[in-house]
């Protein structure tokens, strides 16, 4: 359950191109906007899977001043200072993981006997600093509210090597961390799960468990129509990599999306 901003936290994947553009632009303060669209994704069936799936997800982004709604991050608000420091707080939803193949959330038949990871409401706090118009650093913590699945953290940097009136290229990289409960929810195999699935028991240690990097290009066709393309690479460290349910420790995802802004 790698945090994709792509995160798409729906999990995975993180769609951050437009948000990155907004933070990097030191023009006018946020105004009321509404954008809707669709994105197609090719991604692993779950964090550590060696199989892939395709999915189409709706994109909704609405903002009124400091408050926003985002189909990937949830609802929230952000506060920004003239110095470049900002605080973001969101309330979102994680779809969990199934122990069979799924077309709409993480899951695989290879996890049969492991049981499902419940969907959960979560809250996330992020603190960042836009050091220059082309470089932002951020720390983020995501905590579950409706189920005790542990806390995950990430420390990230976003670099914008190119930005014009119509095109933005952004590169982001993040170090991923999780407490012991989170790591064992996602990568651990309990004695009971071992008996039911046939996998060897495994207790994952908390701490650093991987990196997540993405390259995103967004293009503004007209004031209303925009498109984005993103490629994401995730690498799992030994604390996750040594789990018997991890069959591939380096994974890629790809996203293509179209947005219409009213």
Q: Where are the regions a protein language model picked out?
A:
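Short glycine/proline- and aromatic-enriched beta-strand/turn motifs that initiate or cap beta-hairpins
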Residues: 25-77, 86
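Residues on the lipid-exposed face of transmembrane beta-strands in outer-membrane beta-barrel proteins
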Residues: 38-42, 58-64, 73-79, 125-129, ...
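Outer-envelope beta-barrel architecture signal
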Residues: 28-34, 54-56, 65-67, 83-87, ...
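Predominantly the C-terminal beta-signal and adjacent terminal strand-loop region
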Residues: 171, 218-262
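Glycine/small-residue-rich hydrophobic helix-like segments
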Residues: 191-238
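Structural signature of outer-membrane beta-barrel domains
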Residues: 43-45, 94-98, 144-146, 176-182, ...
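Outer-membrane pore/translocation modules
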Residues: 71-170, 180-206, 239-240, 246-248
